[in-house]
A protein has these predicted regions:
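N-terminal secretory signal peptides and thylakoid transit peptides that target proteins
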Residues: 1-17
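C-terminal segment of N-terminal export signals and the immediately downstream linker at the start
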Residues: 1, 22-54, 272-273
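Short Asp/Glu-rich motifs
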Residues: 15, 26, 111, 188-189, ...
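Acidic/histidine-rich helix-loop elements
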Residues: 72-77, 102-123, 150, 193, ...
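Alpha-helical cap/lid subdomain in secreted, periplasmic
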Residues: 87, 91-95, 119-296
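Serine-esterase "nucleophile elbow" of acetyl-processing enzymes
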Residues: 37-105, 110-112, 128-136, 258
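Active-site beta-alpha loop architecture of Rossmann-like, nucleotide-cofactor-dependent enzymes
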Residues: 13, 105, 147
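Ser/Thr-centric signal marking residues that sit
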Residues: 10, 67-68, 181
């Protein structure tokens, strides 16, 4: 697939801003040319994101493959995108979040994946009870699909296994659940036997993950759009995001969370409530007939 076709076929992915698929109304970015439509725009039609959590987070578990676990393509473990995310969360919460990284390199979603025989075990479906439910997180990130896509696992099997994990984790501890789309890569033929993937198959997997987010009311963090098809964000190995790519991925997940979890702003609002600036601006707004209203 050439670059022009790549961009044309991924336009819907690149337009996403990380909102869960359950939010179906148009976003601000989808409203088109503001000046052309301002005369007929109804503010009531503006999509408002669902608020999944009004309190700060206490414990994060991320379940994933090598990009989650990290490896020699990064000089330091804290360059992993999950670590980037944790630093962003800690920067806005009063108390740091407990961070449990359950990434395993060369991991598969389940024994049904064609990649399973040569993979590092146990697979996600063989370990989520212990690695996720056993820790009872209030924030859960499920980041799978890359290796199974590269092995050409049937989409129906992948979807069923993902659904089992999501359903069981929600039933057991009901965390805010984030699904990430499959990452961009460049070496689709370089690593036998998981060398059956392609951009086309990645797009199908990502549509599957979006549908799971919609069905199970999860937040979608669009890792694919974060990387945007930029080859320079991928390591020499052609598979893993490099340091800069991981910065983008971590920020994309944080963006999705911040847009859907008002609890991440709780500490800020408490700190600023009695500041001179807040007193001044809220007074001026009240005088103008436009008082501050907490809508969340």
């Amino acid at each position: 697939m050439n670059r022009r076709s790549f961009l044309r076929n991924t336009s819907s992915s690149l337009a996403g801003i990380g909102a869960g698929a359950a939010v179906t109304s148009p976003s601000i970015g989808a409203l088109g040319n503001a000046s052309a439509h301002a005369d007929r725009f109804d503010p009531r039609a503006l999509a408002k994101p669902k608020d999944y959590r009004k309190e700060p987070f206490g414990r994060l578990v991320i379940l994933g493959e090598s990009t989650v676990e990290g490896g020699p393509w990064l000089r330091e473990k804290d360059q992993r995108y999950a670590d980037v995310l944790v630093r962003l969360i800690d920067a806005v919460q009063e108390k740091p979040i407990e961070y449990i990284n359950k990434g395993i390199g060369n991991n598969s979603i389940s024994p049904r994946s064609p990649a399973y025989a040569q993979s590092v075990k146990p697979s996600a479906i063989e370990r989520y009870q212990k690695d996720v439910i056993g820790h009872r997180p209030d924030l859960f990130i499920l980041a799978y699909g890359l290796n199974d896509m590269r092995a050409a696992m049937p989409l129906a099997d992948f979807r069923e296994d993902m659904a089992t994990i999501i359903r069981d984790v929600k039933k057991a501890c009901d965390p805010v659940t984030v699904l990430t789309t499959v990452y961009y890569m460049t070496a689709y033929r370089g690593w036998s036997p998981i060398n059956q993937g392609s951009i086309e198959l990645t797009l199908k997997y990502n549509d599957c993950i979006r549908s799971l987010a919609a069905e199970f009311d999860c937040i979608l963090a669009d890792a694919w759009s974060a990387e945007g098809g930029a080859d320079w964000l991928i390591d020499y190995d052609g598979v893993h995001a490099n340091k800069v790519g991981n910065l983008l991925l971590g920020n994309k997940v944080f963006e999705a969370l911040a847009q859907h979890c008002s609890g991440l702003t709780q500490y800020f609002f408490a700190q600023e409530k009695d500041s001179e600036w807040t007193k001044y601006t809220t007074r001026k707004r009240l005088e103008a007939g436009d008082p501050f209203k907490r809508t969340w």
